[in-house]
């Protein structure tokens, strides 16, 4: 069993040749390699050893304050001293002004090494981006330097007991007071709602002004600090921390706001519009969490399979390592393919955002990456447990920890089912979205053809045709909901196949060209055929709303 090792060479290859990072303004390939090499060393040495400690010790609530393991404090001091939080922040606010894609690559490595530590610090980067786009100059000048320097950390406060996926049910209120506002209400499931790294947290809160319209249109966005400028507390208390399946060292808090002083970000009723910047970034961050933990699972499983001697092959004279068995190879290659393909999809989407801004393709790919990569990590962890056999079921080998830590990724930042409904409903009805994604796959087919990969060209062309036919059916269906799951999976597989066509086209530039070509063949022959099943499901007249009501009721 090994600790995570930052996959630096594969990340740099993906950034340069698949995401085409050099198209981003101010991208410097040499500097990116230097920064990420230094980051990888820090993460391997300081962050990766925290993972089993955090899982074992967890967080504690003592006298109303969250306390993290002592080892986390030592690592946070190095994180802060290294200036990692401010990688992409504007230099005028104390940041380093590097591309956001570079910060995302750092974030992937951080999540792979210790997802609980990552959860505690990473939201600040999204809040920095949100304030940079939406806040007044005086708010930016006060808060971005504090966040970039790790003087303060941050949280995002949306969820309430009655308002999970349906934010229109939010009840937390905001009342005008002088030149600001006061917040009253409660929020649950707040990652990083409190911590003792700095003892200071700035919360972005969705709340409803008292004269606001009902529903989503009545929500506004507020910045509420845990402490006021004189150092006194600001009416925010930690009611409890949740005991979770995983992420034991990530503080998931229930917060109470009682006359909490706050400033509005944007105008009244613009809460979701202003929060959109943070929510989209966080959805791609969750996709990268999936990539990172899938990579961790693949690393541990490959190490085990290469050393565990068990069974014989027909042509062997004695016991062999289990990586020589074909079914084990299937599982290992699935892990590796999901990791590399998910990384390629997500980095390319992040690069599109930074280079070109928003687009119909980005809107679609944000949901596709979030869903595909979070499903991929659970599959990768399950396969890792299976390869380990009985040992995989033991805590000592830490594959079960990856499964526990990653399972939440299919739930937060929009459940995967809701993302599927969004794609099969609203986004699919936008002709620009269909055209943009179609063109994205066509370009990948052309790249495969130009690179002399006829089998990949044919396989991806078949997936594209299946996707086109399914899109027409789903877009015109009066009841797309039962088709949404299969349509999202089909769309994800098409994007995954396109990513692998590009990876194969650039195989000679990869750290291990033989590995890329072998995995590309595996994806084509063993993974893409799944698309045909989901295409057929989309053709069926499926209905679930006419099922007997009684079977969904408790006797």
Segments predicted by a language model, with ranges:
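Amphipathic, small/basic residue-rich leader segments at the start of a protein or domain
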Residues: 1-118, 142, 540-555
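Alpha-helix capping/hinge segments and adjacent helical runs
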Residues: 2-5, 247, 363-440, 522-554
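Glycine-rich cofactor-pocket loops
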Residues: 24-26, 53-68, 274-281, 285, ...
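Internal maturation/activation junctions in enzymes
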Residues: 59, 123-124, 135-172, 176, ...
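A structural-propensity feature for long, helix-poor, extended segments
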Residues: 136-139, 143, 422-466
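A short core secondary-structure module
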Residues: 180, 184-233
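A glycine-rich, basic-preceded beta-loop-alpha segment at the flavin cofactor/substrate interface
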Residues: 189-191, 227-239, 244, 251-282, ...
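C-terminal amphipathic alpha-helical interaction region
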Residues: 447-555
